[in-house]
């Protein structure tokens, strides 16, 4: 425990696991209950003795003895102190002394009130002041001790939460536009034109679009945002969004002003016409009509080695004649010479590679080993499957 009242060297705090406050509450409640039970027993005992003495005094008319007994009891009660701890929520803590009127409790004197003794003893006043000051000092240390009882990780989170609440910094959203792309730009130049004249022609075409003035429109998830007073958070772009889906769905449009129309100057054309398609340009330029709205959306650049159009191979199952030709070639050349099998049996078949032939042979061996009910795909005659097993066993023994 850390003594908050004395300024001495304090040992380093060792992180502990959080303790449940339920056990401490039960201990406090039991202690308070036991103190109140002792107080009630003392009050009942003295009230019973008082009743007996009142009855005896009324019968024997011995007023002198009863007065002496009262003096003794009152002196005993004045010197007895009972410390009562308040319930949770009460702030004023003090000591309560049993009054003389406690002897009057009972059915014989119901109207007598319970009053607090006003004339405190000097010793009781000093003790009560010390105890109250000690309790106040202990109350000031409760917050520090409760923080020390947290584990180290929870304590760090505790300080981070308080620091984040105290310093409210504005959150920002970062956007990066790598390139402004137009879908397609058609430029007609003669074959004898130089690279410099080609650059000049493209520059004039783009300048003709931009010189008339542009308006910027915002697109989010394919919808145009008309209200300029909306915030990014209202649109649906939070600042702490780690996913790039929202940022990728945000686009900008370059729109020419409605009051002006731009036209493109006609370049000198010589047949054959050369059509240049730029990869970094999306949109079209018309020589006679008004310029339409151009959408500006960041596009990921493809690597130089990756082709623009990758044709997907069409899966073509092997026919029975192709399977028979494959079996004949393997029987003659073996299972380890697939390039020779390709050049010997499938030389004029461009859609069959030697890897396809190797995979098909493995499939035929597996199909021949399983039962007819488990086979799938185009059925293969059983005599061909028998030849596959025989050739596979022959070349396996020879190569092994």
Curated annotation (Swiss-Prot):
Name of the molecule in the record: Telomere repeat-binding protein 6
Disruption outcome: No visible phenotype, probably due to redundancy.
PROSITE patterns linked to this entry: HTH_MYB
Protein's gene: TRP6
DNA-binding region: 338-365
Compartment list: Nucleus
Pfam families: Myb_DNA-binding (PF00249), Ubiquitin_TPR1 (PF23603)
CDD domains referenced in this protein's UniProt entry, alphabetically: SANT_TRF
Function: Binds specifically to the plant telomeric double-stranded DNA sequences. At least 4 repeats of telomeric sequences are required for binding.
SMART domains, alphabetized: SANT
Species lineage: Eukaryota, Viridiplantae, Streptophyta, Embryophyta, Tracheophyta
Single GO MF annotation: telomeric DNA binding
């Amino acid at each position: 425990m850390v003594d908050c009242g004395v300024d001495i060297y304090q040992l380093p705090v060792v992180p502990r696991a959080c303790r449940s406050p339920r056990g401490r509450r039960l201990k406090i409640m039991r202690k308070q209950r036991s103190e109140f039970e002792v107080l009630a027993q003392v009050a009942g005992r003295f009230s019973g003795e008082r009743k007996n003495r009142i009855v005896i005094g009324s019968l024997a008319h011995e007023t002198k003895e009863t007065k002496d007994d009262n003096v003794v009891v009152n002196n005993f009660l004045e010197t007895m102190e009972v410390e009562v701890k308040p319930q949770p929520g009460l702030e004023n803590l003090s000591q309560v002394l049993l009054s003389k009127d406690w002897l009057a409790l009972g059915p014989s004197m119901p109207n007598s009130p319970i009053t607090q003794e006003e004339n405190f003893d000097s010793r009781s006043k000093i003790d009560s002041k010390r105890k109250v000051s000690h309790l106040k000092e202990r109350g000031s240390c409760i917050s520090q001790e409760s923080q020390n009882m947290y584990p180290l990780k929870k304590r760090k989170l505790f300080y981070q939460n308080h620091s984040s609440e105290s310093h409210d910094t504005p959150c920002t959203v970062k956007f990066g536009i790598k390139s402004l792309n137009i879908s397609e730009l058609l430029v007609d130049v003669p074959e004898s034109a130089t690279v410099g004249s080609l650059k000049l022609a493209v520059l004039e075409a783009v300048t003709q679009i931009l010189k008339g003035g542009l308006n910027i429109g915002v697109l989010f998830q394919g919808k145009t945002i008309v209200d300029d007073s909306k915030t990014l958070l209202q649109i649906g772009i939070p600042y702490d969004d780690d996913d790039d889906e929202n940022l990728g769905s945000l686009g900008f449009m370059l729109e020419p002003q409605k009051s002006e129309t731009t036209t493109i100057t006609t370049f000198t054309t010589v047949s054959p016409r050369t059509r240049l398609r730029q990869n970094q340009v999306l949109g079209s330029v018309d020589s006679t009509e008004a310029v339409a709205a151009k959408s500006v959306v960041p596009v990921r650049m493809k690597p130089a080695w990756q082709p623009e159009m990758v044709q997907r191979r069409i899966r073509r199952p092997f026919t029975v004649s192709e399977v028979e030709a494959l079996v004949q070639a393997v029987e003659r050349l073996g299972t380890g010479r697939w390039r020779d099998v390709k050049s010997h049996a499938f030389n004029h078949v461009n859609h069959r590679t030697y890897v396809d032939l190797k995979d098909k042979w493995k499939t035929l061996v597996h199909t021949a080993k399983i039962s007819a009910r488990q086979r799938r795909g185009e059925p293969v005659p059983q005599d061909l499957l028998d030849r596959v097993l025989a050739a596979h066993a022959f070349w396996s023994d020879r190569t092994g």
